Amino acid sequence: MTTPSDPPAALTPAEQDAAFRPSDTPATPWPVLAQALAEAGIAAHVHGAAPADGVTGVSLDSRVVRPGDLYVAVPGARAHGAAFAATALEAGAVGVLTDAAGRALLAEQGLADVPVLEVDAVRTAAGTVAARVYGGGGDTGPRLLGVTGTNGKTTTSFLAAALLEALGRRSGIVGTILIRAGEREVPSTLTTPEATQLHALMALMREEEVDTAVMEVSSHAVAYQRIAGLRYAVAGFTNLTQDHLDMHGSMQEYFAAKAGLFDPARTDHAVITLDGGEGPRWGVAMARAAGAPVTTLALGPAAPTPGALAEHDPGLRADWEVAELAPDGLGHRFTLRHAATGRELRASVGLPGRFNVANAALAVLLVLHAVGEEHLDALAAVLDVPAGEGPLAAAVPGRMEVVGREPDAVVDFAHNPDGMVQALRSLADARAAAGTRGRTLIVFGSAGDRDRDKRPVMGAIAARAADVVIVTDDTPHSEDPAPIRAHILAGARAEADRIAREEGRTVVIEEVADRAAAIRRAVELAGPQDGILLAGRGHETTMDYDGELVPLDDRVALREALAARVAAASASGSGPAREGKVIES
C-alpha cells in the first residue's frame, strides 16, 4: 500500500479564490448574461445601466471580489449577502446578482443605481451565469465523474482519479481533502465548492488540459444548488446512513437530496451500489429513483446476499457483483463479475476494510463508464497486478491510514455511526487476518453544530466493538464541548453496563477533553498486540473552538505519541520487540 502525501497547507479565502481561477477570462457582456438566464428558463429582471466592460468573474464572497466580477448576493442563515455589496463594489464588482430582498437592501444602502440581475432562485442562477462567464457548460470542460453518498466519497474519488491516470488520462479531483487540476493542488474547505468556484475550476482544468475530473457531491451541494450548470458523464452512489439530519430533518429528505444528483438533467449515467453501508434499503431505492440510466453493483457474499436484495425488490439483480473476495495484506483481492456476460475484472485494493472493496469496485465502474467499454481490456490490465501495486494500491490521507505498528495505529475520518462501525470492523478484520491478538482502543468525539442524535449512538457502537473507549473533543464549532462529550459518554456507559451485565465483559471508558492528551493516553494504555483507532477527523489539521482555529493533525499527534513510546522503550532497554514502529507519511 502506498503512503499518502499530506494535503496542501490551508490558504486564506483570497488565496484559495485566486488558486481556483483561470489565468484569463474574456469579458462577457451584461446582456449575454441576461440571455443565458432566459435560455435556462430563469426569469431575470435587469436593473440599472449595463456595465461598459462586461463581466470577467463571478464571486459569492465579498472579501475576494476582483475588478470585473459579478457579485452574487444570496440570502444566508445570519445575513443577506446584499448587506456586503458595498464592500464588493469597492473591490471592483461591476454588478450584482440577487433577489428582490437583496435589491431592497441595495436601495437602503444608496446603491439603487447599481447594475442588478434580479432573480427568485439566486443560487441556481449563479451556476448558470458562472458557466457562461467561465465558458463552461455543455461539452466544453473536462468530462465529469460525480460521487455521492454518506461515506466513501473521498476514497472512491481518489481511486477513480488514480485509475484514470493509469489509463493515460490527465485527471482532476474536487473533494473534501483537496482540489487538483493536473499538477496544481489547493486545499479544500468544502466537500463541494460553491457553483461560482466550480465553474472557475472547470475553466482552470481546461487550461491545465485535464481530460476527466472526479468530484465529490455532498447533499448540501445538491440542496444549495452548488452544482447548478454542471453536467456529469457518470455519477456514483456509495451508501446512505445516518448523518446531516440537522440539515435534512429525516432520512427520507436526506435521500431525496442525494437522489437529485441522478436527475437526467444533471447526469448521463448512474452507477448505484445496492448494498453499501447498513444494507440494501437505500441502494435499492436509489436505483429505482434515479432518472438517469442505471448500472448496479452488489458486494455479493461478503455483504447482503442477492436474496436480501430480492426482499427489497424481487425484480432486482445487480449488473456487477463483487466475488472471490480474499484478504491480501491489509487490503483485499477481489473479482468484479458482470452478471449478464460473465466478464471478470480482477483487482487488489490496498486499503483495509470490506467497505473499501465497495469503494474500489465503484471507482472501477465509474471509470469504465467514463472511458467506454472499448477500453475494458486496458482497464483490466491496469487492475490485475500484484498486491500492493497499481492504482488501487493508492492510500488516501486520513482514510484508514496506518501510522504505527505494535501497537497497530490507524487514523480514519469515521464521524457517523456507520462510518465508525465500518472502521472498527475493518481494523478487527485486518488484525485477525494477520493473526494479531489484543485489545481494541478507540479515541473519538463528535463535531459541534451537527446532528446531535448520532452522538450517543456512536458511544454505544464504540463500547460494543472496543475494549477501551476514550471520549475526547472533536471540532466543537460554536457548542460547548463538555455537553457533547457527555452525550457520547451516556451512550457508551449505558452499553458498557449492558455488556457487563449480559456478557460479563468489562469495557474501560475514559473522558479526556484535550484531544492530543487523549491520543497520548491511548498510546500509554496500548500493548504491542493492541490496536488503536483514532476516529472522526482524518486529514483535518485544525479544530474550530467557536471561531478560534487550533492546530491539530491527528496523524501527526499519533505519530509523535508513538515515537515518544519508541524512544522511552529504547531508553529503558525493554528491547526492540516492545518498541513498536512509527510509519511516516
Predicted features and spans:
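Short, basic phosphate-binding NTP loop
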Residues: 2-148, 156-168, 305-306, 346, ...
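Active-site beta-alpha connecting loops in nucleotide-dependent enzymes
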Residues: 76-79, 387, 396, 418-420, ...
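Short internal beta-strands
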Residues: 90, 94-100, 271-275, 443-444, ...
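Short, conserved loop/helix-junction motifs that constitute active-site signature segments
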Residues: 90-91, 108-111, 228-231, 261-266, ...
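Acidic, Mg2+-coordinating active-site environments of NTP-dependent enzymes
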Residues: 104-106, 110, 234-408, 496-498, ...
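Phosphate-binding loop of NTP-binding sites
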Residues: 125-274, 278-290, 365, 583
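Glycine/aspartate-rich loop-and-adjacent alpha/beta segment that forms the canonical ThDP
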Residues: 531-564
